[in-house]
Amino acid sequence: MAQHSVYFPDAFLAQMREAMPSTLSFDEFIAACQRPLRRSIRINTLKISVADFLALTAPYGWLLTPIPWCDEGFWIERDDEDALPLGSTAEHLSGLFYIQEASSMLPVAALFADDNHPQRVMDMAAAPGSKTTQIAARMGNHGAILANEFSASRVKILHANLCRCGVANTALTHFDGRVFGAALPEMFDAILLDAPCSGEGVVRKDPDALKNWSPESNLDIAATQRELLESAFHALRPGGTLVYSTCTLNRQENEAVCLWLKETYTDAVEFLPLNDLFPDADRALTPEGFLHVFPQIYDCEGFFVARLRKISSLPALPAPTYKVGNFPFIPLKGHEALHITQAASAVGLLWDENLHLWQREKEVWLFPAAIESLIGKVRFSRLGIKLAESHNKGYRWQHEATVALACPNHAHALELSPQEAEEWYRGRDIYPQTIPAVDDVLVTFQHQPLGLAKRIGSRIKNSYPRELVRDGKLFTSNV
């Protein structure tokens, strides 16, 4: 395999020699860092089972090797990699899998370990969405996730990935994570803090990742991490589980941050060892029970994961002084709720009691019921999924609702050919051989919903969002 030319500061190498257990080879560490990272994917079980995905993609000749800590995760090797980018395959476009680095699947595995079934979860640093979508899949779109992202530009990317993967149980916020301990004290059953870090573990993906590295910056970052972890711990309910993770390798940003929390809240913090998370986990185990994954251990990105439990309540922090503002939505109940539920069902959109109908002017939304108790406590960037816009002739059903809620076996679903599906993704109208009998047509491919479209004569008018339209080579050569 080709080698990367990775930039290693001398001080970094000295730090790694000190941090690395004596059971590991430093030469193997350097060699692993210089190998390109193996590609990996996670099957999105909100849309397809692992068995059905493997059967669907079997004709492609993809070599899929299971990732030991994630039942839905696979390292992938493809003969057609140069001909067709993984992100342009039909299965990726319809949300059947997420391109995700193998070690970044570890934190969510830890969050749900030991048969943990949280109902309200916060992902404190969520973009671009790999872990939020993984959490949603583990929850089966039930309960609720608050997905926070501090970077405004990344919130849009986060929402696009949630939409593609059919996630319906999530609220988005755009805050510095340090506000949540005061704003939402002891409100969450589980919290994932995949903390901003120095990124020492990503050199296999970015050989220049350490160009701006310094020991001083590590200490500055660790100070921010301590504040974020403290905020997350305050937002966690007693008995709840918190996972702290980074994609860096130094102890200051990893073990030291967790030990600081334990020293600060001695009687409230319990470390939960991860030695049984997956077979062979003990190869990366620290004395505290954390996983400190150097890249040569499992041939993946460098990573750190710690799991802890909050065993007692904490005194509340001073209440935040910001104003949330008036909430512009009202709940829909009774006849109005029944009417839109029946109209949605007629076009193949179905949901259960986990989602509640709300309205803002002519917009109809579905909010996860488990998030409603947070309304008025924090300002949301986006809450739930937009179901429809009402107009004189009925409802204009929204793309994100179709992807998340549509029943692909609906009586009036129109299954496209590969060529027609590619035309759909290019934003072009479809002229099917068999004209549907209804005006609102659920368009599917590989029995996955692509959108709801209007039939106009013999034409199916394309409703694929303009910002998602693809050019360039797509997947027809692959199906």
Swiss-Prot record:
Subcellular location: Cytoplasm
Active site positions, chain numbering: C247 (nucleophile)
GO cellular component: a single term: cytoplasm
EC number: 2.1.1.178
Biological process per Gene Ontology, one example term: rRNA base methylation
Keyword Calcium: no
Disulfide feature: none
Annotated catalysed reactions: cytidine(1407) in 16S rRNA + S-adenosyl-L-methionine = 5-methylcytidine(1407) in 16S rRNA + S-adenosyl-L-homocysteine + H(+)
One example GO MF annotation: rRNA (cytosine-C5-)-methyltransferase activity
Binding site for S-adenosyl-L-methionine: A125, A126, A127, P128, G129, S130, K131, E149, D176, D194
UniProtKB keywords: Cytoplasm, Methyltransferase, RNA-binding, rRNA processing, S-adenosyl-L-methionine, Transferase
CDD domains in the record: AdoMet_MTases
Pfam families: Methyltr_RsmB-F, Methyltr_RsmF_N, Methyltranf_PUA, YebU_pre-PUA_dom
HAMAP family documented for this protein: 16SrRNA_methyltr_F
Its biological purpose: Specifically methylates the cytosine at position 1407 (m5C1407) of 16S rRNA.
PANTHER family, A to Z: 28S RRNA (CYTOSINE(4447)-C(5))-METHYLTRANSFERASE-RELATED, NOP2 YEAST -RELATED NOL1/NOP2/FMU SUN DOMAIN-CONTAINING
Family (UniProt): Belongs to the class I-like SAM-binding methyltransferase superfamily. RsmB/NOP family.
NCBIfam families: nop2p (TIGR00446), PRK11933.1 (NF008898)
Protein name in UniProt: Ribosomal RNA small subunit methyltransferase F
Organism: Salmonella arizonae (strain ATCC BAA-731 / CDC346-86 / RSK2980)
